[in-house]
């Protein structure tokens, strides 16, 4: 009995561990793992199927093939446990030891481990400071390497070819030692004294000047230090003993017909053993050197293939010509150990079936077929049957269930009651793809799904399948109910809006109910209350659309939950009054007293959730759905061909457009317009014709004229089915109706360009063959795109999840004093996103001051909810500094205050919430809705870009932002600064619009003056860039020599002459060094100064500048001295959609990025080279100036002598995120990425909260470059984790030492994932080999902080409910550590009683650990 107990205990023994360390295995360690040496390549005996002795499957080394039975059969059964059979030498034990016992092979000659050799950068190469080619030549026996130079002129590590070796031998004899093969490399590695080398390199580092050499030394130093601190020895990178995988992990399975299926590893091992044995034999026979050498090389190659096939040379192939799967292939890739088995497991207690509609279900229910339920809940049913005494044994219970006896169904009903099940639909793109429901048993074989959750699952009923999972334990059921129940997931985690909104039929039904019809039966009746209305409708006295008066009683609930009732008479319709029956008390009747479209219903649900909470909303949503279905049925809205009414004006509009096109065609033929202009104009004509037709059609469809009861004509919204469907948002859109009843319009080619002949027909008239062909042309690309899009979007989501997976909320408040500045987002003058949308649910970082006073409106650390946002709007606050995860100071994780509101729950976020994964899902999930294409700007778009004025849309007053200006002779302002902005402020001080205005803009209004809507307030010439005079005086030409640096041109039409400066390249050699300029002099002939400075007013002229003034001409302030023609900017393709989002998150550099000023100072141009200009920026304080070479073809925005600020744009182009971070700081780069990503999603109408993008940006910014190391362990120029550096700095500051300084670095998401602290997480993401090699060499240990690592080692994740478990474990660990520390310094035991007590403690401790 005691044995049995001991045996059972031994089974459940699990090691408690807090981290996983990876390192190099020494030969002794490998031998200690091994249970014996594998000496023969044989596997099993083909006749007896018994494993061969000392072979790859040997039972003596690896354990018995059958449980508790030795190979020869002498000992069987449990009583002989642990006996080793004297005949066959097999230990009698469980057969599962064959999964864990390893063997080994003693190699006759050392072999280099290919990962440390070939995985770049080559660790062996770095260690020995030799090139990879040289090492390979040594290893594969092509040349010798000197190991011990002795007293000769040779050096250690020098390469010798066969000839030079022989020459050296003749010259020096055996003074020196040179070898080839892995032995040589082994000896070189052994000879390295790490400590000495490290000291030496640390000393020489500061004195190294060349950048490349410094980098190389730093790399080598880091590698050596990694080896030194981790206790790995360099020579362990060369294998002397090869471990053999346990046989059950590389199985050999007999198939019928006497053939075998085997794992590729067996072939690879056999190869190694064969060659190793042959090499041993050759060495015993003392064979000639060349043969031994060849055999050693082959051994090296076979070990390479076993470890990583195909890494070097050609992959070894099996009998069927496919490369064999090596050990490395086993762990990497989608089918490897990490992604196939550790991160994605299959689960039991699950089933799947097709889904159908369950319109009668409540929101928290799902219909489960009886057959499935019976199968899934079997264990519970057995338990209940036995507990009830209906079955005596489990076997009897099984029989009952198989026969499906009547009692079984009763028991099933009970078991299933309040036992939630989880439904999942693949692809699970966000957390709403798995939700819990209470099952309701149904007949049939399809799962019934509640229609309102379809949106979250993205499910429809055209054959979709779903999987059911049963949570077994009580805890799992609790979590499913409390966290995953569909009723708890009403708001979307991506944007905080209801995800449970009615769509399609339900919307149509509610819309139909709430419409009004003039002259409806029962119009003008007056009702005392809603129940009378119900009576009137039921008896048919009044129809549903009739306009009536009803007395309504409303309940309003104030903040304290006090209810007050109020009664009023409302003009409404029968249908709306009926809707008020299901309206929960506390909501205003006005919410349903309108046409209920999809938007209105969504708003209604949102209001309900915010005012009344979860429970009421859920009940209300269900009621809305039932009502909607009911009235959709009653309405009988359907689509017939007569509903598509074609407007009569269509034909005249099309004829007009055709006439215009003909006219342009004639102009083109007579040479008045170019081909490009003709194309653009034709497309514009057709586009506007299409607009007109669709407008006429919608007017025709949407309104009908009827005679009301006073006999007067009145217009009312039409009851046309197609119009109702589109107007309510149930199905279709104006664009689709246009194709049905208007004209199809212009079509695109697969490359995105527009075909200039439109399709004038619509679907009701039908298309002819040519029109049909044109339609298919662009449509096919759409289908191909969709397939690619899904894959790309999935990959983006995977990268996002991987970079953000370990970000969890771990504390309440980190105390960060700063945050991001939030302003309303304004583009091209329109407010795209008001301030309230951007700050709702976030925490204030710096007190919000009431505008125009000193009073604090919202104190720091206020969570801005809807009420606060209303207050901010009342006081017209136009910027708020809010806390953000980007500026959060928490070390490993973030704090709740910096994150703000949990969007899916509506209150501040809880501890342990996995915000990283939620953010990744929220960004990735709509990825499939984004487009895949690059937009080519054609037609209207490219011409709009050359705008030349600002026309305001709102009345208000004018404000200028960072603008310098001068007044010209007419008293108008002329802008003389770059990147100036002009804003319109309303009377409350709120910013309504904002525009960028270029240098040289003339303003029609002064600052702070009033403007009216539609007024043009600024003008500029888009095609030339002026040089504006800032003083009045006379023009003096400098270095302007006719025919050398300039030419005179006379305009043929006007006869005016102007001076054109020659480009440097076009000048003669005499003019190359001259710098043409215009100087301004006063009446006395002295230089004038620029106002406020002592800099003379002298303007250098670049090449091609056109000077309109002559020498000595008079000039006024604000006049243009010269104009530089701008080549119209090349139409750049705009990358849109998914590729753009991926580029932003990968932080890729654009092709021709904008050039930004690296420092603030004055611009000048240095000596030019062949294709480049030298730009010099000299700072005002006289410190070091900055030089940059810029290609000539780049269009510069700056001139000689101009002042620029750091980070200002010098040459236009797309800005690179890295530059923005370096020159303008974290806040700007965050703003840039957030806005750019949001632009893409906004185009598709997808709403995502900014927080999610910020979370990803935080992860992209978590590394930094050390600029000076201070007293820390870091090296200068090393990349380190920001949190690590901050922790180290805090400790140093506490000790009064110098902290390290660092520069934040922006990494793309792939790079950032691979650079995480956790090697397990990185290895399971991408580039497994590289990650593991690096980790092993550094002896890294993984602290299992993130989610992925914990899933892989089979623990609860440190998020959600697992967060508490991990917290508890950490607390226990801390107390254990404290105990250990205390035990070390405990005094010696003095009395017997104390000794006894200690012993008792120890025993208790030991007992507690079991």
Swiss-Prot record:
InterPro entries linked: DNA-dir_RpoC_beta_prime, DNA-dir_RpoC_beta_prime_bact, RNA_pol_asu, RNA_pol_N, RNA_pol_Rpb1_1, RNA_pol_Rpb1_3, RNA_pol_Rpb1_3_sf, RNA_pol_Rpb1_4
Cofactor dependence: Mg(2+); Zn(2+)
UniProt-annotated binding residues for Zn(2+) 1: 70, 72, 85, 88
Gene3D superfamilies on file: 1.10.132.30, 1.10.150.390, 1.10.1790.20, 1.10.40.90, 2.40.40.20, 2.40.50.100, RNA polymerase II, clamp domain, RNA polymerase Rpb1, domain 3
Pfam families for the chain: RNA_pol_Rpb1_1 (PF04997), RNA_pol_Rpb1_2 (PF00623), RNA_pol_Rpb1_3 (PF04983), RNA_pol_Rpb1_4 (PF05000), RNA_pol_Rpb1_5 (PF04998)
Gene Ontology CC: DNA-directed RNA polymerase complex
GO molecular function: DNA binding; DNA-directed RNA polymerase activity; magnesium ion binding; zinc ion binding
Reactions catalysed, as given in the entry: RNA(n) + a ribonucleoside 5'-triphosphate = RNA(n+1) + diphosphate
SMART domains: RPOLA_N
Family named by the database record: Belongs to the RNA polymerase beta' chain family.
Subunit structure: The RNAP catalytic core consists of 2 alpha, 1 beta, 1 beta' and 1 omega subunit. When a sigma factor is associated with the core the holoenzyme is formed, which can initiate transcription.
Protein function: DNA-dependent RNA polymerase catalyzes the transcription of DNA into RNA using the four ribonucleoside triphosphates as substrates.
Protein name: DNA-directed RNA polymerase subunit beta'
């Amino acid at each position: 009995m005691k044995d049995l107990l001991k045996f059972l205990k031994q089974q459940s023994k699990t090691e408690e561990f807090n981290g996983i360390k990876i390192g190099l295995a020494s030969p002794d360690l490998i031998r200690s793992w091994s249970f014996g040496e594998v000496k023969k390549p044989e596997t099993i005996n083909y006749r007896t199927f018994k494993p061969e002795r000392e072979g790859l499957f040997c039972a003596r080394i690896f354990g018995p093939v059958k449980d508790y039975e030795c190979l020869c059969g002498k000992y069987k059964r449990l009583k002989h446990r642990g006996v080793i059979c004297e005949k066959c030498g097999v230990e009698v034990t469980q057969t599962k030891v064959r999964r864990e016992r390893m063997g080994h092979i003693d190699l006759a000659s050392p072999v280099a481990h290919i990962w440390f050799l070939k995985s770049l950068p080559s660790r062996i190469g770095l260690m020995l400071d030799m090139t990879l080619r040289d090492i390979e030549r040594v290893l594969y026996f092509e040349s010798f390497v000197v190991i011990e130079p002795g007293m000769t002129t040779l050096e250690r590590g020098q390469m010798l070819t066969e000839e030079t070796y022989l020459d050296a031998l003749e010259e020096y004899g055996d003074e020196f030692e040179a070898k080839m093969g892995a032995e040589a490399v082994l000896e070189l590695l052994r000879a390295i004294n790490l400590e000495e080398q490290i000291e030496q390199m640390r000393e020489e580092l500061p004195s190294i000047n060349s950048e490349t050499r410094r980098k190389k030394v730093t790399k080598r130093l880091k590698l050596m230090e990694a080896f030194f601190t981790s206790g790995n020895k360099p020579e362990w990178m060369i294998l002397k003993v090869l471990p053999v995988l346990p046989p059950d992990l590389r199985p050999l399975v007999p198939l019928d017909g006497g053939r075998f299926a085997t794992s590729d590893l067996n072939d690879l091992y056999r190869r190694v053993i064969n060659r190793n044995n042959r090499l041993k034999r050759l060495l015993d026979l003392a064979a000639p050197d060349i043969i031994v050498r060849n055999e050693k090389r082959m051994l090296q190659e076979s070990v390479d293939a076993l470890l990583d096939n195909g890494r070097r040379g050609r992959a070894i192939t099996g009998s069927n010509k496919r490369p064999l799967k090596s050990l490395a292939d086993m762990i990497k890739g989608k089918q490897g150990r990490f992604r196939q088995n550790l991160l994605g497991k299959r689960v039991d207690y699950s089933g799947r079936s097709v889904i159908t509609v369950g319109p009668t279900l409540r929101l928290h229910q799902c219909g489960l077929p009886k057959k499935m339920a019976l199968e899934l809940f079997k264990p519970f049913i057995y338990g209940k049957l036995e507990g009830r005494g209906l079955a005596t044994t489990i076997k009897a219970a099984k029989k009952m269930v198989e026969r499906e006896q009547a009692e079984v169904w009763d028991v099933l009903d009970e078991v299933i009651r309040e036992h939630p099940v989880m439904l999942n639909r693949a692809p699970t793109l966000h957390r709403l793809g798995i939700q819990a429901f209470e099952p309701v048993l149904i007949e049939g074989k399809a799962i019934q799904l509640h229609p309102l959750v379809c949106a979250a699952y993205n499910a429809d009923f055209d054959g979709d399948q779903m999987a059911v999972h049963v949570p077994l334990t009580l805890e799992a059921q609790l979590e499913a109910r409390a966290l995953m129940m569909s009723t708890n997931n009403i708001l979307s985690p991506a944007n905080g809006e209801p995800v449970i909104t009615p769509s399609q039929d339900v919307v149509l039904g509610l819309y139909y109910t709430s419409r009004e019809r003039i002259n409806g039966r029962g119009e003008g009746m007056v009702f005392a209350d809603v129940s009378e209305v119900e009576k009137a409708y039921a008896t048919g006295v009044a129809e549903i659309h009739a306009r009536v008066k009803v007395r309504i009683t409303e309940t309003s609930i104030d903040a304290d939950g006090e209810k007050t009732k109020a009664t009023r008479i409302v003009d409404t319709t029968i249908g709306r009054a009926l809707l008020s029956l299901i309206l929960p008390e506390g909501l205003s009747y006005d919410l349903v007293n309108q046409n209920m479209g999809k938007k209105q219903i969504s708003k209604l649900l949102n209001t309900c959730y915010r005012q009344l909470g979860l429970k009421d909303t859920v009940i209300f949503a269900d009621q809305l759905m039932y009502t909607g279905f009911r009235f959709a049925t009653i309405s009988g809205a359907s689509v017939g061909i007569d509903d598509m009414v074609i407007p009569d004006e269509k034909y005249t509009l099309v004829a007009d457009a055709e006439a215009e096109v003909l006219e342009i065609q004639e102009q083109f033929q007579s040479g008045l317009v170019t081909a490009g202009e003709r194309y653009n104009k034709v497309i514009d004509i057709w586009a506007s014709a299409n607009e007109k037709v669709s407008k006429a059609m919608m007017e025709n469809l949407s309104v009908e004229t009827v005679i009301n009861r006073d006999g007067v004509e009145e217009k009312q919204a039409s009851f046309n089915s197609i119009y109702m469907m589109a107007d309510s948002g149930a199905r279709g859109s104006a664009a689709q109706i246009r194709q049905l009843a208007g004209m199809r319009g212009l079509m695109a080619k697969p490359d995105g360009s527009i075909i200039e002949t439109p399709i004038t027909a619509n679907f009701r008239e039908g298309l002819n063959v040519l029109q049909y062909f044109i339609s298919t042309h662009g449509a096919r690309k759409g289908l191909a795109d969709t397939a690619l899009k899904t894959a790309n979007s999935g990959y983006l989501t995977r990268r996002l999840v991987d970079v953000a997976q370990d970000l969890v909320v771990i504390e309440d408040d980190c105390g960060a004093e700063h945050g991001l500045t939030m302003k309303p987002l304004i583009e091209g003058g329109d407010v795209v996103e008001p301030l309230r949308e951007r700050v709702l649910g976030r925490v204030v970082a710096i007190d919000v001051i009431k505008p125009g006073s000193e009073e604090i409106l919202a104190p720091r650390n206020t969570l801005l909810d809807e009420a606060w946002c209303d207050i901010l709007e009342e006081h017209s606050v136009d910027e708020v500094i809010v806390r953000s995860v980007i500026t959060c100071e928490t070390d490993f994780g973030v704090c709740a205050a910096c994150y703000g509101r949990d969007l899916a729950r509506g209150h501040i976020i809880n501890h342990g919430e996995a915000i990283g994964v939620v953010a990744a899902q929220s960004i990735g999930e709509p990825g499939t809705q984004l487009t895949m294409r690059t937009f080519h700007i054609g037609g209207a778009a490219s011409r709009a870009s050359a705008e030349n004025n600002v026309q305001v849309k709102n009345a208000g007053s004018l404000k200028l932002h960072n603008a310098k200006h001068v007044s010209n002779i007419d008293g108008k302002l002329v802008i003389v600064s770059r990147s100036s902005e002009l804003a319109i402020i309303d009377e409350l001080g709120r910013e309504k619009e904002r525009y960028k205005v270029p240098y040289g803009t003339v303003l029609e209004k002064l600052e702070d003056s009033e403007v009216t809507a539609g007024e043009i307030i600024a003008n500029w010439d888009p095609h030339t860039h002026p040089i504006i005079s800032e003083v009045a005086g006379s023009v003096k030409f400098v270095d302007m020599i006719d025919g050398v640096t300039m030419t005179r041109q006379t305009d043929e039409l006007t006869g005016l002459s102007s001076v054109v400066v020659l480009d440097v390249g076009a000048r003669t050699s005499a003019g190359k060094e001259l710098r043409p300029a215009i100087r301004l002099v006063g009446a006395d002939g002295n230089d004038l100064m620029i106002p406020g400075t002592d800099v003379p007013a002298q303007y250098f002229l670049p090449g091609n500048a056109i000077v309109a003034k002559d020498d000595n001409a008079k000039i006024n302030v604000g006049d243009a001295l010269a104009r530089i023609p701008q080549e119209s900017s090349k139409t750049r393709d705009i990358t849109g959609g998914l590729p753009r989002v991926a580029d932003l998150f990968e932080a890729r550099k654009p092709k021709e990025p904008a050039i930004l000023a690296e420092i603030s100072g004055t611009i000048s141009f240095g000596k030019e080279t062949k294709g480049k200009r030298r730009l010099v920026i000299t700072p005002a304080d006289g410190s070091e100036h900055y030089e940059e070479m810029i290609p000539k073809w780049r269009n510069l925005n700056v001139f000689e002598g101009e002042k620029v600020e750091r980070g200002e744009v010098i040459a236009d182009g797309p800005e690179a995120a890295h530059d923005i971070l370096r020159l303008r700081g974290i806040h700007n780069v965050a703003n840039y990425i957030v806005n750019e990503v949001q632009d893409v999603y906004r185009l598709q109408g997808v709403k995502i909260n900014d927080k999610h993008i910020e979370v990803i940006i935080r992860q992209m910014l978590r590394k930094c470059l050390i600029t000076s190391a201070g007293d820390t362990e870091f090296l200068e120029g090393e990349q380190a984790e920001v949190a690590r550096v901050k922790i180290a700095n805090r400790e140093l500051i506490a000790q009064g030492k110098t902290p390290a300084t660092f520069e934040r670095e922006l990494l793309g998401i792939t790079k950032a994932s691979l650079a995480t602290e956790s090697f397990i997480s990185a290895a399971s993401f991408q580039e497994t080999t590289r990650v593991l090699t690096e980790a092993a060499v550094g002896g890294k240990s993984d602290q299992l902080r993130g989610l992925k690592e914990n899933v892989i080692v089979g623990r609860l994740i440190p998020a959600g409910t697992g967060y508490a478990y991990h917290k508890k474990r950490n607390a226990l660990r801390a107390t254990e550590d404290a105990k250990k520390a205390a035990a070390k310094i405990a005094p010696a035991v003095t009395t017997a009683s104390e000794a006894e007590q200690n012993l008792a403690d120890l025993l208790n401790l030991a007992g507690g650990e079991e």
